[in-house]
A protein has these predicted regions:
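Conserved hydrophobic register position within alpha-solenoid helical repeats
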Residues: 331-334, 365
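Auxiliary alpha/beta "docking" domains used to position bulky ligands
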Residues: 28-216, 255
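Iron-sulfur cluster-binding cysteine motifs and their immediate structural context
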Residues: 45-48, 222-246, 252, 266-268, ...
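Alpha-solenoid helical repeat architecture
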Residues: 323, 354-355
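Amphipathic alpha-helical scaffolding segments comprising HEAT/armadillo-like alpha-solenoid repeats
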Residues: 313-316, 343-354, 375
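Short inter-helical turns and helix N-cap capping residues of alpha-solenoid HEAT/ARM repeat scaffolds
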Residues: 327, 357-358
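Core register positions within helices of long alpha-helical scaffolds
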Residues: 337-340, 367-371
Length: 375
């Protein structure tokens, strides 16, 4: 073989290899992009407002931050955080086959600023997220439908999560570009403000990540300044033991006295740090029918709530996340609000609960009666 012939063959081989690699590249990435577009279209058809993608296998620091949070005892009585710490550390600790995360957002924005409702001290304040149907039930079926479609398209396994397993959804959402964790530690979106429910599908398929979102809080400290219990030791840090959402929902016993007056009329959750955020000016009200506020759960009268027995409680909060905490814990919260109402006409409502079978309710009733009697 002549040298010139050998060189020609090498050039031909190199050209063929280049064409093969180029063809493979253009086959893989357009297919991947087409697949992601199809998944987004399916998510939108199911009612999701946002659908973005993140790597589930890349390293991250969220697990380390959570460990510091738990080590400092800031998780309070949420012992499940400590027992599931290793599984929460990284998505692959939940499922070592996870390669991609499809992160879904569902807007639950209210149609008005809810904070002025706190001025009516004879009514209870229920967090915006809990005024409609339980979002777990609203989202989970749709996630399963979408996950089935993704599995069929990719031929790879999938797993579904909606705040019911030890998966850290907010860091994944930031990594996927849905928003960023604000100084109040909640997810914040430039298009939906503070009002997004999250769901995650983990897939064994490599779908390719979307760009992450940067933090856009700047010098604003509105969420930190408005907190009625100073639950933020520093920006981007939360001490759950001081948080009214934790106290009204997760904490089972009698509250420390220092927080009872601070709760005002908040009887389930607290929206102060969410609702005060300037980014909410870009948010729209939710159009999801099952998340619309029920009239009975917007500023309900404290006297009516204090009279609830277990059956009436279950009826009033049917399909609502409030039902999860049970009648006794809820009535405890109502009694703290009655004590803060300044309305002496509510004293009989509290007095009737001085003999309640539950000792925590009795303690709250005694506190409410004493507080109102001093006014």
């Amino acid at each position: 073989m002549l040298v010139s012939e050998g060189r020609a063959d090498l050039r031909k081989a190199a050209s063929s290899a280049h064409l093969l690699l180029s063809s493979t590249f253009h086959q893989i990435f357009p297919v991947r992009d087409h697949l992601k577009t199809a998944i987004r279209d399916s998510a939108a058809a199911l009612g999701f407002d946002v659908c973005r993608f993140a790597s589930a296998s890349d390293p991250w620091s969220a697990g380390e931050r959570l460990a510091h949070f738990v080590e400092a005892g800031r998780h309070g009585e949420m012992g499940w955080m400590e027992t599931t710490l290793e599984r929460r550390a990284h998505p692959t600790a939940m499922w070592d086959g996870a390669r991609s995360a499809i992160v879904l957002g569902l807007n639950y924005g209210p149609d008005h600023d809810p904070l002025p409702e706190l001025a009516d001290r004879s009514a209870g304040y229920i967090s915006v997220y809990a005024r409609g149907d339980d979002y777990h039930e609203v989202i989970k079926g749709r996630l399963k439908t979408l996950a089935g479609q993704i599995a069929a398209r990719t031929g790879e396994d999938v797993k579904v999560f909606v705040d019911t397993a030890p998966l850290m959804e907010k860091p994944l959402a930031q990594r996927a570009g849905l928003g960023w964790q604000g100084k109040h530690t909640n997810l914040l979106s430039r298009t939906h403000g503070n009002w997004l429910f999250l769901g995650v599908i983990l897939s064994a398929a490599e779908l390719g990540p979307d760009p992450p979102e940067d933090e856009h809080c700047g010098t604003c400290t509105a969420c930190l300044d408005v907190c009625p219990t100073n639950a933020f030791p520093a920006p981007f840090q939360l001490d759950a033991r001081r948080c009214l959402s934790y106290l009204t929902i997760e904490f089972a016993g009698p509250w420390p006295v220092e927080f009872r007056s601070a709760t005002g009329s908040r009887i389930y959750g607290c929206d102060d740090c969410l609702a005060v955020c300037p980014w909410n000016k870009f948010a729209a009200a939710s159009n999801e029918s099952r998340l619309q506020a029920r009239e009975a759960l917007v500023s309900p009268r404290l006297a009516d709530l204090a009279a609830l027995d277990d059956a009436a409680f279950r009826t009033l909060f049917s399909k609502s996340p409030v039902k999860r905490i049970g009648r006794d814990r809820f009535v405890r919260n109502v009694l703290y609000a009655i004590g803060n109402s300044g309305d002496a006409d509510l004293i009989p409502s509290a007095q009737r609960l001085l003999d309640d079978p539950d000792p925590v309710v009795r303690d709250a009733a005694e506190w409410a009666v004493q507080r109102l009697s001093l006014r």
